[in-house]
Amino acid sequence: MQINKYIDHTILKADAPKSKVQQIIDEAKKYDFMSVCINPTWVNYASQELKDSDVKVCTVIGFPLGANTSELKAFEAKNAIENGADEIDMVINIGAAKSKDWDLVESDIADVNAVKGDKLLKVIIETSLLTDEEKIKACQIAKAVGADFVKTSTGFSTGGAAVHDVKLMRQTVGPDMGVKASGGVHNLEEAKAMIDAGATRLGVSAGVAIMEGLTSNDSY
C-alpha cells in the first residue's frame, strides 16, 4: 500500500501564514503526497511551487459552511481552476439537506460540476451534521450529478471522519466513486482503519506523522 498516495496534505486554518503553506508544500514534495489541500488564496502560489512535481493542488469551495449561493460556488471553482487548482472540494448546502430540499442540494453540486472541466470534484457532505438517511441521500445525489468523490467533513464542524460513515458512504456510492475521509485522522493506525472502511483519499494535516509512524495532534 502506497499510503502517501492516499493523502491530501492539508492546511486550511484561517491564520496559517505563508511559511506554514510552504512547509506543507515542501512536505508534500518530500513524501510525494497525492495533493496539498489549501485555501483558494494560496492556489496560484502552490501551483507554481508544485509545477515540476506530481503533487496536485486541491482547494475548498463554499467552505466551511456550504451556505454560499450556487452561483458563487461555481465562480469560486472556476476561479480556483484558472489559478491552477487540480481538485475542488466543495461543501454541499447543508441547510438544504436538513430541510429535505434535495433539488437545491442537487442543483448546487451540478452548478460546480458544470465548470470543473477535466478536474476532480469532491463533495463534502459534513457527516457530523447529517442523519444516516441524509448522508445516503447526499451521496446518491453527488454520484448522480457526476462528482468524482464524496467527502466526510470540512474539519471545522462538530466532528470529523468516522469509520461508520466511511463504510456507509462506500456502500452507497459503490466501488468506482472516490470516498475521502477528512478530519480526525492522526496516525497510521487510524489512516489504515479509514482505508479498510473504503476510503480512497485521506484529508489530513498529519501526513508526515502518518508516514513516520507517529501521532499528530495538529488540526487543519
From Swiss-Prot:
It is found in: Cytoplasm. One of its GO terms (biological process) is carbohydrate catabolic process. Its EC number is 4.1.2.4. Belongs to the DeoC/FbaB aldolase family. DeoC type 1 subfamily. Catalyzes a reversible aldol reaction between acetaldehyde and D-glyceraldehyde 3-phosphate to generate 2-deoxy-D-ribose 5-phosphate. HAMAP family: DeoC_type1. This is Deoxyribose-phosphate aldolase. The gene is deoC.
